[in-house]
A protein has these predicted regions:
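HIT superfamily nucleotide-processing domains
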Residues: 1-90, 94-159
Length: 159
């Protein structure tokens, strides 16, 4: 089987790039710096289904991402979760949280309608994150701005 990004992740996220194992996405919700790692392995639903090598690599990539997001966005707390109740494809959320954000201290899911980024905000975020993450590579044949949400009323429902 060939890896294919779940349609819901494609709809709700903006492609940033990829690491050795994972595709890096940014959730199109400007209320929170919210990023998603998706291991580029076909038919994966759970972390334990990955090979031992891939599990270790996922841990490294997730830790690297979380640390750099915390630094870049001066996080009060990083929320990291692999839930997958709505989107069965294995994906790991990395959400920068602040004690002053709208949903604090509750989880962000389903609390408020998403507020999509403007094209300028997307460009600014892509520049910042790519500068911070030295080893993120482009996703072949994919322009980040082509994944802008067309449905501007999407809720924070990718879980």
């Amino acid at each position: 089987m060939i890896f294919q990004l779940h349609p819901r992740l494609e709809q709700d996220c903006i492609a940033i790039g990829r690491f050795e194992l994972c595709r890096l996405l940014m959730m199109n919700d400007s209320q929170y710096p919210w990023f998603v790692l998706v291991p580029e392995r076909a038919d994966m639903r759970e972390i334990y289904q990955l090979s031992k090598t891939d599990r270790q690599l996922l841990t490294e990539e997730s830790s690297y991402l979380a640390e750099n997001l915390a630094i870049l966005y001066q996080a009060d707390k990083m929320n990291i979760a692999a839930i997958g109740n709505m989107v069965p494809q294995l994906h790991i959320h990395h959400i920068v949280r602040y004690q002053t954000d709208k949903a604090w201290p509750a989880p962000v899911w389903g609390k408020f309608d998403a507020v999509p980024y403007t094209e300028q905000q997307i460009a600014d975020n892509l520049t910042r994150i790519k500068k911070q993450l030295k080893n993120v590579k482009p996703v072949p044949n994919l322009e980040p701005l082509t994944l802008l949400l067309t449905n501007q009323s999407t809720k924070n429902s990718v879980k």
